[in-house]
Amino acid sequence: MAEYDLTTKIAHFLDRHLVFPLLEFLSVKEIYNEHELLHGKLDLLSDTNMVDFAMDVYRNLFPDKEIPNSLREKRTTVVAQLKQLQSETEPIVKVFEDPETTRQMQSTRDGRMLFDYLADKHGFRQEYLDTLYRYAKFQYECGNYSGAAEYLYFFRVLVPATDRNALNSLWGKLASEILMQNWEAAMEDLTRLRETIDNNTVSSPLQSLQQRTWLIHWSLFVFFNHPKGRDNIIELFLYQPQYLNAIQTMCPHILRYLTTAVITNKDVRKRRQVLKDLVKVIQQESYTYKDPITEFVECLYVNFDFDSAQKKLRECEAVLVNDFFLVACLEDFIENARLFIFETFCRIHQCISIGMLADKLNMTPEEAERWIVNLIRNARLDAKIDSKLGHVVMGNNAISPYQQVIEKTKSLSFRSQMLAMNIEKKQSNANRNETPNWAAQDAGFY
């Protein structure tokens, strides 16, 4: 299913360390030639300090060849650099291991006050922060993500937002937590990084767009693993104009993930309202990006073409199974997609043949009847089944005019506030901001 694989597009907006899990997934799925994937891993590893990993990949790629001297020499260099940085950082680490320092860090919110305390009690100096940052970055490049996260936490607590490495340290901390699969910590870091980007009033519009595009792609790891992720992705991607603009301008392929989050959302009332807004975006962007997942929504809610929707749903299954971020959503997606087909069909027909419905849902009549019974039992459907005639008779579920007005206007206040905020930010924009440049981010993935 390489036709719909987005790994190459997504990798352009990821740090190279974040690409490795995607390549491992592709290797398991056997979508691409294994030899090509190993070459890709080796290329990615060339600009990292994960030399042992590179040697393992080289052995798998060239089992009959000796490990190149260049890799052996690089390993010697990396070990020497690590020892040097460890000796430089040892007195700094001892300061943070002190119980009194730990208590002070937990109780003090002000980084300047904490720095002054450390300077007074332990002779802490400004250059220690640069050493700590270099050591954290080196640990990250070696693949020691837990060490990197720990030292970057210390660094973040102490440096002001104006520090030249402050923004990079946030990117590094987020990447480290993602790679350790610490989703609670990663969600906190993602929120912190987003606030930093959104509140930076001195960046150019192009720099802000670039930063948000990176954040959108990195956030996929968090949103599709954190329990509240599918709610948060809708809020950020669909209802934050700056991020929706970034998706429409730079990465319309992200609509696949937004659409999946909407379809698999467990809040039925919210899902129905969100679907209306999503359909508008999918229609607007259909000329720049489409895949079976976005086309399923278009077939069902724009064209009301149930046969095409059923066909696209079968294609969606193949797309989901082979997508690193979405494979865990497969069951929820298929279940809710069938419900969407059913609900839309029921709005048009008051009385429906179970046989016809089974055909539309790609189920046997017995499976379809059991499925509908479960919907009625779980209060997700106002309907009755006539078993003799094999019909489903829909209940009267009319919405009052007052409720219709409330549904149509309840999001206007929020959108007006966001519009006002964006106008204020544009008026105060100046000329400077740093682009995300953590660890091995380079032109190859930028």
From Swiss-Prot:
Localization per Swiss-Prot or TrEMBL: Cytoplasm; Nucleus
Q: Which CDD domains match?
A: eIF3E
In terms of InterPro entries, this protein maps to:
eIF3e, eIF3e_N, PCI_dom, WH_DNA-bd_sf
Stretches the record annotates as Disordered: 426-446
Which coarse location class describes where this protein primarily resides?
cytoplasm
A single MF term (Gene Ontology): translation initiation factor activity
Q: Quote the Pfam families the UniProt record gives.
A: eIF3_N, EIF3E_C, PCI
Its GO biological process terms?
A: formation of cytoplasmic translation initiation complex; translational initiation
Q: Which UniProt keywords apply?
A: Cytoplasm, Initiation factor, Nucleus, Protein biosynthesis
**Which HAMAP family does the record match to this protein?**
eIF3e (MF_03004)
Q: Which PANTHER family does UniProt cross-reference here?
A: EUKARYOTIC TRANSLATION INITIATION FACTOR 3 SUBUNIT E
Role this protein plays:
Component of the eukaryotic translation initiation factor 3 (eIF-3) complex, which is involved in protein synthesis of a specialized repertoire of mRNAs and, together with other initiation factors, stimulates binding of mRNA and methionyl-tRNAi to the 40S ribosome. The eIF-3 complex specifically targets and initiates translation of a subset of mRNAs involved in cell proliferation.
The family line of this record is: Belongs to the eIF-3 subunit E family.
Q: How does it assemble?
A: Component of the eukaryotic translation initiation factor 3 (eIF-3) complex, which is composed of 13 subunits: eif3a, eif3b, eif3c, eif3d, eif3e, eif3f, eif3g, eif3h, eif3i, eif3j, eif3k, eif3l and eif3m.
Protein name per UniProt: Eukaryotic translation initiation factor 3 subunit E-A
Q: Which gene encodes it?
A: eif3ea
